[in-house]
């Protein structure tokens, strides 16, 4: 009897559902996946090596470009590692601002994920809904840092600047009439904090809309329930973290288990799944957005009542004031030295991990006492998740591979780095 050979199929790297530059070599028996072999490295930019030739502060913008939909959380892990080595205390207000923007970034990431995941599976409307909300949060990024994506807002010792008193408003143009302009600017008359407060006041209704479209949708459940099941034991063995681990029923969240900044003061719950399939991971991420609203509201309330500095008073690390530089020669020299030579970090090594929207994002930093890192190692959550793809996809159809890639929430900037 003739032996039937498996059929090999290249999925990506130019595939719209490949989430970047994933090349997946699938071994198929008919339409059933026997083996999935991910090929990585197509977006490798040598970030870890580049950091060795840049001062500590010059590497902050590289962090934004790792997972380019969770920008500020990447920066957070990096500056925490530097602060551990320097042994400096970050002002309380800066810690609250960081936590607030971590949660804004988490919502940004999950909105991108829910839109793209639904689009991959075949539900287009959610993508348009999610981007409507992302636009407001992108405007918040722009208001505090001047950039919509690559913010470089977190700095060793604090944040670049305090939250501005005025939220930028849309201007009149050929494509906007007065009525449309008034509606777009109605929440922008106050400060940035007022705008964020207004956003999180109306955001729960938006999450309800996504759930109305998806959670009980018959087709959505047929495509996700029972697909890509990972047992709790295997999830731990494969190094899964974040929603991928919590979807399998393990309540591991660094914000609770190893709290950093002011997360130990925050009141929130850690959602966990039951079955460890794509549907449970979807439910976990949707609930995470609701918990981010709770955390953000607590931060907003505290920030309203407690003004103060947002940068450390350690002048080895903190730049001088703009006013001082215009009148004082010493301040100008200090500023020049800080941004050309940088600051020297004591010899030693440190590991800092943050609860990234995708999992545990860690930075292992080795310093030899110079103004540049001796070695920088990035622990990207997506790397372990992609490694589990073969096991998760075996026995499923080709169409299910798209669902599994979507549920892993993969971004190649951090995997290839």
Swiss-Prot record:
Return the protein name.
NADH-quinone oxidoreductase subunit D
- Give the enzyme's EC designation: 7.1.1.-
Function of the molecule: NDH-1 shuttles electrons from NADH, via FMN and iron-sulfur (Fe-S) centers, to quinones in the respiratory chain. The immediate electron acceptor for the enzyme in this species is believed to be ubiquinone. Couples the redox reaction to proton translocation (for every two electrons transferred, four hydrogen ions are translocated across the cytoplasmic membrane), and thus conserves the redox energy in a proton gradient.
Q: What are the protein's GO molecular function terms?
A: NAD binding; NADH:ubiquinone reductase (non-electrogenic) activity; quinone binding
Pfam family of the protein (one): Complex1_49kDa
How does the entry describe its membrane topology? Peripheral membrane protein
Q: Which HAMAP family match?
A: NDH1_NuoD
Q: Which GO terms describe its cellular component?
A: plasma membrane
rRNA processing: present as a keyword of the record?
no
What is said about its interaction partners and assembly?
NDH-1 is composed of 14 different subunits. Subunits NuoB, C, D, E, F, and G constitute the peripheral sector of the complex.
Instruction: Enumerate the subcellular locations listed in this protein's record, separating them with semicolons.
Output: Cell inner membrane
Catalytic activity, reaction form: a quinone + NADH + 5 H(+)(in) = a quinol + NAD(+) + 4 H(+)(out)
Family to which this protein belongs: Belongs to the complex I 49 kDa subunit family.
